Amino acid sequence: MKKVRRKGSSGLSELSEKAREQLAQAELRKLRQQFRKMVDSRKSFNFRHQRMIAGQYKEIETLKAEQAETTMLLSLVKSPKNLDINQKNFMELRFLLQTKGDYEALISSMKVLLGELDDKIVQMERKITNQRQLFLRTQEANNPKRLQRQIHVLESRLNLVTVHFDTMLTSNSQLRKEIEDLLFEKAAYDHVYQQLQRRLQTQKKTMNVAIEQSAQAYEQRVEAMARMAAMKDRQQKDISQYNLEIRELERLYDHETKLKSFLLAKLNDRSEFEDQAKKQEDVKSKKLGKKGKGESFASYEVAHLRLLKLAENGDLNQLTEDFLAKEEKNFARFTYVTELNNDMETMHKKTQRIQDDIINLRSQQQTSHEGTRSILKQMEEKLRKTTQEADIYETKYKEMSKTLEYLKNSVEKMFKKINCDATEILGKLGESGKVTDINLQQYFAIIEKKTNDLLLLESFRRLQEAEGPDVDVPQPFVNPFWGGSALLKPPEPIRVVLPVFGADSFSDKLEEVDSPLDHSTLQQMVLENFLQRERTKELQDTMSEKGDEIRLKKKVIG
């Protein structure tokens, strides 16, 4: 074990020594590289330093040479010979400047003369072109076929313009009729609207009256119901009181019946006793025979004895008074019972009458409610129909008012676009310069008059175009009724152009067409002619520019 450990420690020491050697070699390499770099940098620094020093030496030498030259030049300048030469040069320069000013004045005067000559040349060329145009016109005027063709073309154009004018007039009259119809319809709708408003107000009033009546009927019903409830309560109280009184009376009646039965029993007993007494008296009378009036007295005595037996204290007066009092009480009770029976019958009749009245009131209330409901339903149906009609008429009125407003705005725009004079309308009282229902006809009349004038101007312009362009070119006129006329440009100012002679292609095309042309074909032909003219103008401009360049070159050479 010890040997193995020694071998391992020796191996580790060898490895550490090798690693140290490698590290030392690497550090040595790095140091050598750094040394080389420092040597190279030193060499380069020395080389640059030497170059800088050499450049500075060269600059010093050049500066010395320049200093020598400047000193020599200063010495030469200050010499009297050079001073004389400078004086001579100064005098020559002054003379040359004076001559330059004279020549410039001559050049400006010559330019003015050349401009005048150019103007004269332009005027002469214009005269030549006018003479040529007059010559061509005379030739064309003397040509009968050309004249017939021009007449045919002008007639076709006039026919188209008149047809267009007639269509515009018919459309204008139709629009005027439509506006009048719309105004009448508006007035009728306004009248109907006012009537419907009145009917609606009356319906609302009747509805309010019906509502008030129904409210009053409801209040009366509530009052009647309250009365009925009070009467029912009163009836129940009366019935309860009546029942109590009946019970009391029945109790009294039972008591009286018991008393009567008792009295009847007593009376029956008494009558039996009296019958027995009468029988005994009869027997005695039979026994005694015929006796006088004294025997009746004995009977009275017997009766008197019986009455004394019946009396409590032997007082017959008290007995009679008690009997009479009892009879009076019985009679009073009998009368009271009869009165109560009569009152019961009257109360029954009253309750029956009240019940009949309640039934009648309920039936009347039900019928009145049904009537008011039916009336309210009818009124609601009428109100719904009237509101629907009013809504329909209101929508129609809004549509008509929108169309009228659109027509008014279009008329006002057309009036302003064609520059119509509104002094006649504005001179009237209450006019504010806006198109209204009242002054619409007047605006139409002014627009119609202006369209007639514009069509006359258009026909005159077309006649002038057919005859040929004059010297004084008129102002451009834009026809509002033709779409192609807006594409035509106004005539440009005349420039000096090389004369180019050629036939008019547009007139030749019109001559080739035998039938009258419509608006679309005319517009197409005008556009083609316009494009062709633009091309020819561009060619003429290029040629004129070339001619101007040649003239300038000639002038410069001259």
Swiss-Prot record:
The lineage of its organism: Eukaryota, Metazoa, Chordata, Craniata, Vertebrata. Residues 10-44, 185-259, 369-414 form a coiled coil. Plays a role in spermiogenesis. Involved in the elongation of flagella and the formation of sperm heads. It holds the Pfam family ODAD1_CC. Keywords: Coiled coil, Differentiation, Spermatogenesis. It comes from the Eukaryota. Disruption phenotype: Male mice are infertile despite regular copulation. Display shortened sperm tails and malformed sperm heads and motionless spermatozoa. The 9+2 structure of the axoneme seems to be intact. Spermatozoa are able to activate oocytes when used in intracytoplasmic sperm injection (ICSI) and these embryos are able to develop to term. This is Coiled-coil domain-containing protein 63.
